[in-house]
Amino acid sequence: MFTMKKPLLLIVLLGIISLSLCEQERAADEEEGEMIEEEVKRSLLGTVKDLLIGAGKSAAQSVLKGLSCKLSKDC
C-alpha cells in the first residue's frame, strides 16, 4: 500500500507545480494584454490630438486671412 502512495503523491505534486506555472503564465499574459491596450489608447489619443491641432491651425489661418483681408480692404 505504501508503494502506491509514493507515485500518487509524486503525480499530485507535479500537477500542483504545473498548475502554478500555468497560473503565473496566464497572469503574465494578462499584464501584457493590459500594456498593449494602454499603448493602443496612447496611440489613438495621440492621433486624435494631432488631428485636433491640425484642424485648429487651419481654422486659425483661415480666420487670420479673413481678418487681414477685411483690415486691408482687399476683399
UniProtKB/Swiss-Prot annotation:
Tissues in which the protein is found: Expressed by the skin glands.
Main subcellular localisation: secreted
Any Pfam family hit: Antimicrobial_2
Positions of the propeptide removed during maturation: 23-40
GO (cellular component) term, any one: extracellular region
Disulfide bridge positions per record: 69-75
Location of the protein in the cell: Secreted
Gene Ontology BP annotations: defense response to fungus; defense response to Gram-negative bacterium; defense response to Gram-positive bacterium; killing of cells of another organism
Key words of the record: Amphibian defense peptide, Antibiotic, Antimicrobial, Cleavage on pair of basic residues, Cytolysis, Disulfide bond, Fungicide, Hemolysis, Secreted, Signal
Keyword Secreted annotated: yes
Signal peptide stretch: 1-22
Record flagged with keyword Disulfide bond: yes
Family, as annotated: Belongs to the frog skin active peptide (FSAP) family. Brevinin subfamily.
Task performed by this protein: Has antimicrobial activity against some Gram-positive bacteria and fungi but has no activity against a range of Gram-negative bacteria except P.faecalis. Has antimicrobial activity against the Gram-positive bacteria S.aureus ATCC 25923 (MIC=19 uM), B.licheniformis X39 (MIC=37.5 uM) and R.rhodochrous X15 (MIC=9.5 uM), is virtually inactive against E.faecium 091299 (MIC=150 uM) and S.carnosus KHS (MIC=150 uM) and inactive against E.faecalis 981. Active against the Gram-negative bacterium P.faecalis X29 (MIC=9.5 uM) and is inactive against E.coli, P.aeruginosa and S.typhi.
Name of this chain's protein: Brevinin-2HS2B
